[in-house]
Each structure stands twice: as structure tokens, then as C-alpha cells.
């Protein structure tokens, strides 16, 4: 009932930059503001076409300087104005450093502070239990503490980022719990199938 199968809830591919050259987002990279804003505008147009509710505004690989932080905030403020007359929002996602070395945004609390500094209900956190467990742990308490700022949830197994039916996190407990806490959005599953997609999708039977 609550696990998303569709593409409409989050659209997130158009702000990664040039993946072949090592990009993993652009919005916090001071030298690429123009490119980041062009990508935001393109993502916004695509999101309107596919009726997406959210755009994933990826920070990118950069240092933790004040300049990078200001760049990220300024680009998000630009994005805030871009979407203000639409039903489309933006999500920022803390990623784990094991899989994403050098990524700017790595902690849920850091993401919350950025949301506060941007000052818009259209900017929310994408809370990916896989990344949060690896980087920080204490996932349920951390989710509850930041719930007003969470706009989307993703799940996958820890470790391996495979189907969310085994590993360190028990999603048969976690998913009902986040709704008890007051979360009202969708839960997306972003993972690498252990075998094939068709064989792996059986895990969803436990979440109907």
C-alpha cells in the first residue's frame, strides 16, 4: 500500500552532471553554478511532463567549505523560485561516504539545517534508510527528530543495497513505524536486484 512502484513521486536524474567525469550532482560546486541552474530548469521542465512531485537536487562532490555551503543554499533558493507556482518540490539527500566519496551532503542534521536556511516548504529531505544507517545509524530516532523536514523515503538492504528483505534493518518494522510517527508520503525502493528484477520483486508481497 505504501511502497511506491511508480516514477511520478521522485524524479532525480537530471541534476547529476557528467557522471562519466565523476560528477554526482552540481548544486554545491562553486565553479558550476550556471551549469547547475541550467540543469535545474531542465529537470523542472521534465518533471512537469512526467507529473513528478519532486526533483532530487544533488549537492555534488566538493569540499566542506563555507563557499560550497553558500553555493548550495543559493542554488536551492534559485530552485525554490523556479517551482513556487507549481506542485513540484525539491528533495536533498544525505549520501553515505563509502559509496559516494567526497559528497557534500552526508548527515540528516546537515540537510535539516540547509532546509531551514533556504526557508521554504518546497525543499525537503529525502531520507534514505540505506545511506543513513551506514553514515549515522539510530535511524528511527533520527527519522522522528527530523520528520517535519522529510519529504520522501527510500529503502534498501544494508549491506549491499539489494532488496529490502534482509540485512541490518528490519523494514517490516520500520515502515509501519514511520507511519505511526506521522509520515504521510510514499516509500520508494532503490536497490540493485540480487538476481533479476522479476525474481527480486517478490519482497513487496510483505508490504501490501
What spans do the regions from the language model cover?
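Mid-chain, structured segments of secreted extracytoplasmic proteins
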Residues: 13-27
Amino acid at each position: 500500500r505504501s511502497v511506491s512502484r511508480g516514477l511520478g513521486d521522485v524524479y532525480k536524474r537530471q541534476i547529476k552532471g557528467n557522471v562519466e567525469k565523476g560528477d554526482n550532482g552540481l548544486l554545491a560546486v562553486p565553479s558550476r553554478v550556471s551549469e547547475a541552474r541550467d540543469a535545474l530548469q531542465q529537470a523542472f521542465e521534465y518533471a512537469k511532463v512526467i507529473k513528478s512531485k519532486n526533483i532530487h537536487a544533488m549537492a555534488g562532490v566538493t569540499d566542506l567549505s563555507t563557499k560550497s555551503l553558500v553555493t548550495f543554499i543559493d542554488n536551492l533558493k534559485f530552485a525554490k523560485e523556479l517551482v513556487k507556482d507549481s506542485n513540484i518540490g525539491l528533495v536533498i539527500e544525505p549520501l553515505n561516504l563509502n559509496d559516494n566519496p567526497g559528497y557534500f551532503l552526508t548527515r540528516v542534521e546537515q540537510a535539516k539545517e540547509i532546509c531551514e536556511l533556504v526557508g521554504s516548504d518546497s525543499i525537503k529531505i529525502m531520507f534514505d534508510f540505506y545511506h543513513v544507517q551506514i553514515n549515522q545509524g539510530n535511524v528511527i530516532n533520527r527519522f522522528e527528530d527530523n520528520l517535519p523536514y522529510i519529504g520522501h523515503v527510500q529503502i534498501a538492504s544494508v549491506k549491499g543495497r539489494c532488496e529490502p528483505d534482509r540485512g541490518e534493518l528490519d523494514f517490516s518494522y520500520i515502515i509501519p513505524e514511520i507511519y505511526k510517527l506521522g509520515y504521510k508520503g510514499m516509500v520508494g525502493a532503490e536497490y540493485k536486484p540480487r538476481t533479476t528484477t522479476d525474481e527480486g520483486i517478490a519482497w513487496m508481497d510483505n508490504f501490501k
